[in-house]
Structure formats: C-alpha cells, structure tokens
A protein has these predicted regions:
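A short beta-loop-alpha structural element at the N-terminal edge
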Residues: 7-33, 171-202
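A conserved beta-turn-beta hairpin within the catalytic core of GNAT-like acetyltransferases
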Residues: 81-91, 255-265, 323
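Conserved acetyl-CoA-binding loop-helix of GNAT-fold acetyltransferases
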Residues: 100-116, 140, 273-288
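Conserved beta-strand in the GNAT
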Residues: 66, 72-80, 234, 243-255
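Conserved GNAT acetyl-CoA-binding A-motif
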Residues: 116-129, 291-304
Length: 347
C-alpha cells in the first residue's frame, strides 16, 4: 500500500463541488466504484442535506471529513450521528483512483475514530461488502466483525392491494406505540443471539422512539436511505402470551420519495406465520407511495443470517437475494466484568 501525502480535515462549504463530484464517481453504476460495496447508494451530496444553518445550538446531521492533497480533495468520509445513543455510522467512504486509495481511506477512518472519541461517540458502525479489502481495512482500525446481512430485493411489478381496517385488525396487526417498548425489547431478545445483544446494547428507551428517529433494529441500509415517511407496526401473538402483551413480529416500512427502493425491515419469532404480515407491508407501500413512481421503484429488505427462516419467507413473497454485506462495530467504552467505582472524568 502506497503512503499518501496530504492531510485529513473537516469538510468546508467551499468543498461542496469537489465532494459532489467525488461522491458521484464513487457511487457510479460500476460495482467497483461503490466505496463500501453496498447495493444501494445514497442521494447525491447537496448543500441542504449536509450543511445546516451555523447556529451554535445545533449540530449538523452528518459529519464529513476530507483528505486534501495539493489543494485537491482525494477522499471523503461521511458519518451519520445518532445523538440519542451517541453512535456514529459510516455511510460513505470514498477514495477514487490512485495507487494510495487504500491508505487514504485508512487515514480517514483513523481520523474519524480520534475525533469521534473526543466528541463522546460510544460506538462506530459500518456495513460493507467483503471485497476490495473493505473488511480488512476496518478490522485493522479495531472494528469487530459480528455478523452478515443478506439484502433481498423485490422488483417493481404487481403488488398486493392495501388491506382494509377490518382485515388488519383480524390479523392482529396494529401501529406501534411507545407503550410497546417492553414487548418489543422482549421480541428483540428472543430473536437475537446474546453476543449481538451485548454489542448493540439496545435499550428499552430506544424502542420508544417513533417515526424518522427510529433506528432499531439496526440494518445496513437505514442510514443510507433517507426516507420521507416511516411507518411501524406490530403483530400481536394469539392469546397474548403469559402477560397478554407478547408480540410475534415487528415491521418497519420506509416509503421512499426519492429515486430509491422502498424499505422493509421485519423482525419476527421463528414460529410465527409472517406471510400475511409481509403482504400487509407491501400493501402499506402501495397505499402510501407516490402513484407516479410506484411502478419504477422496487422494495429492498435486509435480513441478518441468524434471522432464518425470515429470508425464505421473503423469497416466497417475490424477493430475491442481490448481495451480502458484513456488519462491523467498534466500541470506545471499556467493558468490566464486575461493577465497581472508578475515577470520574470530564469530557
């Protein structure tokens, strides 16, 4: 790997034109130019999506870092910050062309980790294809590989009709509410392996967040797809379980208003019949999507490998496997085996 000459710094408004061109090149149609190897790229970089009004009380939604060399932008790294959980997610990492592109990307990641730790970030997330040394780059920077996620896609075409209120009620499907937080936490614990639960550290309070702020359960595509509308539903268990609140499934639907696929994330118990739940989800998209674009956009659904047989139920519903991505994470906190008093520090 060639050693690059240059420096990493925070992006400035005057970098916008160069950033837009670099992002466009890295997210072209050729697979080799996708910086992280994800099958869906984000919307083009624009001044309104990346830079907010310079008010001291507000932080920009995204943080950008660039690699500058000889007055030119040779690389960029963009992260989405979840202020509620102090988690940062890498959504773009570009360095197009040149023999030292790998070193440029590594230096951007190292700068991100240093700057994020100073700003109180507790976890860094990234999802990438296991190609072009993506996984090796992040593991060299201290990230831990904890799972894989299959990306399934349903091509535009015939979609189920929206359900009536009576059909929805009879199937035990209803919109979520903050009161479902405990039941959703139990559902997540029932379908997620213990090691992944410890790494993701999803709290009951995270399940209370609604709408666009909902970031659980995590997937590789949530930070990249910028939804106009997000809808969430639960599938109630027949009989309600021991305490009457048990849930068999959770559904998150993102209806895209841009030139991107609609989004579907399902979490369900292995023994639950989710086929009606999936048909309901597709009906929600038909009902909520812009009718002029419904026939052009497909539906994309991420499924983690340990969530089987959910992937087979999606394939039965017309979805096909288009990619597999690797999930990695780095923690800045130190885990302890036993609680104890430690010296306090000031950030």
């Amino acid at each position: 790997m060639a050693r690059s000459t240059g420096k990493v710094r925070a992006a400035r408004l005057t970098d916008l034109a160069a950033l837009g061109e670099l992002s466009r090149l890295a997210q072209g149609e050729a697979d080799a130019t996708r910086s992280l190897g994800l099958p869906v790229s984000g919307p083009p970089i624009g001044v309104f999506s990346l830079f907010r009004l310079p008010l001291g009380a507000f932080q920009p939604h995204d943080a950008l870092y660039v690699f500058e060399r000889d007055g030119h932008i040779a690389g960029l790294l963009r992260v989405e910050r979840d202020s509620g959980r102090d988690e940062w997610t890498v959504v773009e990492l570009d360095a197009v062309g040149g023999l030292d592109a790998g070193d440029v990307r590594f230096r951007l990641v190292q700068h991100l980790l240093r700057d994020g730790a100073k700003r109180g970030a507790t976890r860094f997330h990234v999802a990438c294809a296991d190609a072009d040394d993506n996984v090796e780059l992040f593991m060299q920077a201290g990230f831990v590989r904890f799972g894989d996620e299959r990306i399934l896609f349903r091509r535009p075409g015939d979609m189920p009709a929206p359900w009536s209120d009576a059909e929805t009620r009879d199937a035990g499907i209803r919109p979520t509410s903050p009161l479902d937080a405990v039941a959703l936490s139990r559902l997540y614990a029932a379908v997620t392996p213990q090691p992944v639960q410890r790494l993701e550290c999803v709290r009951i309070a995270d399940w209370e967040r609604q709408g666009r702020d909902w970031r659980v359960p995590r997937s590789s595509l949530v930070p990249i797809l910028r939804f106009a509308d997000v809808y969430t539903y639960v599938l109630e268990s027949r009989g309600g379980g021991r305490d009457g609140t048990q849930l068999d499934g959770f559904l998150q639907v993102g209806v895209a208003k841009e030139d991107q696929p609609h989004y579907l994330k399902v979490m369900a118990r292995p023994e639950a019949d989710v086929a009606p739940f999936l048909r309901f989800a597709l009906g929600v998209i038909v009902e909520r999507a812009d009718k002029s674009t419904l026939g052009r956009e497909g539906v994309i659904a991420p499924v983690r490998t340990y969530e089987s047989p959910l992937d087979r139920r999606l394939e039965d519903g017309g979805f096909e496997d288009i990619a597999t991505v690797t999930l990695l994470m780095k923690e800045t906190l130190v885990r302890v085996a036993e609680p104890r008093l430690v010296p306090a520090g000031v950030r």
